């Protein structure tokens, strides 16, 4: 574990730290720690997936990162500034979160109303709101949905409106908390593309707490939680080629890697791949 951390520090030595989590512990009942002395860094413009089984602590850490929970021990820094739980301004202005079920984020009659609500809370000048909402809606391709009743939207459309609401406030860090879990396959695929675009085109730092092993392959780095502690961190290619670790931690394989493994059992050798296009390209070149 220490070796993983040192390697990550060396690879990112010239990048600013977006989050520094230092020796954080948390307990809901003040007896049993859900997070136990957790430390890790996340760098600016990095896409990090946090994974682990139910009860591992991954959803709790997301709530600590956005200030919904106050750790009983440890410190949290964002872009070098220690977060005071008496003043959340620096945290609130730099971090946005999209939850598993976006319904709780909708309060207006239309999608546009819901996006505007977040801007009103930030006391944004009403004269520029329409331009901000339009720009945010273009990023996630929902301009045609702005005047529609939020309750009539599909799950995938609601998630895109929720993302637009976050983007409108222009945070540097965006956290997705199990955001693909309630979506159909098409919705999941659309959301995964948006996550990549936010990192690659909008230069956001993206953190995804997820059970979706196929999404994890898109990340720059994976952090694995178990029983309130980090047991492994590394690139997807490092994590998912370590079959001994996957077996010992009872983690599932992404579908595309299961398929690659099955091909190898049929004497069709392929390299590590993160999507079906890469896999098909390798297979076609072998013919």
Curated annotation (Swiss-Prot):
It is found in: Cell membrane. Residues 19-252 form the ABC transporter domain. Keywords: ATP-binding, Cell membrane, Membrane, Nucleotide-binding, Translocase, Transport. The keyword Membrane applies. The keyword Secreted does not apply. CDD domains: ABC_cobalt_CbiO_domain1 (cd03225). Its main location: membrane. One of its GO terms (cellular component) is ATP-binding cassette (ABC) transporter complex. One of its GO terms (molecular function) is ATPase-coupled transmembrane transporter activity. PROSITE patterns: ABC_TRANSPORTER_1 (PS00211), ABC_TRANSPORTER_2 (PS50893), CBIO (PS51246). It is a peripheral membrane protein. PANTHER family: ENERGY-COUPLING FACTOR TRANSPORTER ATP-BINDING PROTEIN ECFA1, HEAVY METAL TRANSPORTER. Belongs to the ABC transporter superfamily. Energy-coupling factor EcfA family. Forms a stable energy-coupling factor (ECF) transporter complex composed of 2 membrane-embedded substrate-binding proteins (S component), 2 ATP-binding proteins (A component) and 2 transmembrane proteins (T component). This is Energy-coupling factor transporter ATP-binding protein EcfA. It comes from Malacoplasma penetrans (strain HF-2) (Mycoplasma penetrans). The gene is ecfA.
């Amino acid at each position: 574990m220490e070796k993983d951390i040192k390697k990550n520090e060396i690879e990112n030595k010239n990048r600013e730290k977006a989050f520094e989590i230092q020796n954080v512990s948390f307990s809901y009942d003040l007896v049993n720690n859900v997070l136990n002395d957790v430390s890790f860094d996340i760098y600016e413009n990095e896409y990090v997936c946090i994974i682990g089984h139910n009860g591992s602590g991954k959803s709790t850490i997301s709530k600590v990162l956005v200030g919904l929970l106050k750790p009983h021990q440890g410190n949290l820094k964002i872009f070098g500034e220690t977060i005071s739980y008496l003043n959340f301004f620096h945290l609130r202005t730099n971090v946005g979160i999209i939850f598993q079920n976006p319904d709780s984020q909708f309060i207006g009659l239309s999608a546009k109303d819901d996006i505007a609500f977040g801007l009103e809370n930030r006391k944004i000048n009403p004269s520029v709101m329409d331009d901000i909402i339009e720009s945010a809606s273009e990023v996630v391709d929902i301009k045609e949905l702005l005047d529609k009743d939020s309750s009539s939207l599909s799950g995938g459309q609601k998630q895109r409106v929720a993302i637009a609401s976050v983007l409108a406030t222009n945070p540097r860090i965006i956290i997705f908390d199990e955001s693909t879990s309630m979506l159909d396959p098409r919705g999941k695929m659309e959301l995964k593309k948006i996550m990549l675009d936010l990192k690659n085109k909008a230069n956001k730092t993206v953190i995804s707490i997820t059970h979706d092993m196929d999404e994890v392959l898109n990340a720059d780095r994976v952090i694995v939680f178990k029983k309130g502690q980090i047991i492994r961190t590394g690139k997807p290619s490092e994590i998912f080629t370590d079959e001994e670790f996957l077996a010992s931690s009872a983690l599932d394989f992404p579908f595309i890697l299961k398929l690659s493994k099955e091909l190898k059992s049929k004497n069709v050798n392929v390299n590590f791949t993160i999507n079906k296009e890469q896999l098909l390209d390798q297979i076609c070149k072998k013919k």
